[in-house]
Design a protein with these regions (language model features):
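Active-site catalytic microenvironments in core metabolic enzymes, especially phosphate/sugar-handling
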Residues: 1-99
Length: 99
């Protein structure tokens, strides 16, 4: 049963020691180092979910934009880019004919 989830957008490796002594059941973040995450899990820390760095940060940008607009109204113009900067993009390719 998951009761409490901690989320850190971007690289959250630096919080593992703090989470080891918390009541968190699952930790969602990015860029976890292989050996560091393995050692953490060996000591019964929370379950780890390692998502793409870009995806972890991009999801909250519309929320930040809305807060800026709420605070500053028409004194500021905002726009959240839709340009994906994730270097880990995979696209299907057309099969090449055999020669």
């Amino acid at each position: 049963v998951v009761r409490r989830v901690a989320v850190c957008g971007g690289s959250g490796d630096f919080l593992l020691d703090e989470l080891a002594h918390s009541d968190v059941d699952v930790y969602v973040t990015s860029d976890l180092r292989h050996h560091r995450a393995g050692e953490f899990l060996e000591h019964d820390g929370p379950a780890l979910i390692d998502v793409a760095h870009w995806a972890a940060e991009w999801t909250w940008l519309p929320v930040v934009e809305a807060r800026i607009v709420d605070a500053l109204g028409d004194r500021v113009s905002t726009r959240v880019s839709t340009h994906c900067t994730d270097p880990w993009q995979f696209r299907p390719v057309e099969p090449q004919e055999s020669r």
